[in-house]
UniProtKB/Swiss-Prot annotation:
It comes from Agriosphodrus dohrni (Japanese assassin-bug). Belongs to the venom Ptu1-like knottin family. It is found in: Secreted. GO terms for molecular function: calcium channel inhibitor activity; toxin activity. InterPro entries: Assassin_bug_toxin-like (IPR012325). Keywords: Calcium channel impairing toxin, Disulfide bond, Ion channel impairing toxin, Knottin, Neurotoxin, Secreted, Toxin, Voltage-gated calcium channel impairing toxin. The keyword Nucleotide-binding does not apply. This is Toxin Ado1.
Amino acid sequence: ADDDCLPRGSKCLGENKQCCKGTTCMFYANRCVGV
């Protein structure tokens, strides 16, 4: 589902989900951030 994603600000490394649309995983910060 489209809502099964990581919202902005969540940890993203090692998670089973992708960052939500409009955000990306910042590797060094381990956070989903807006692009």
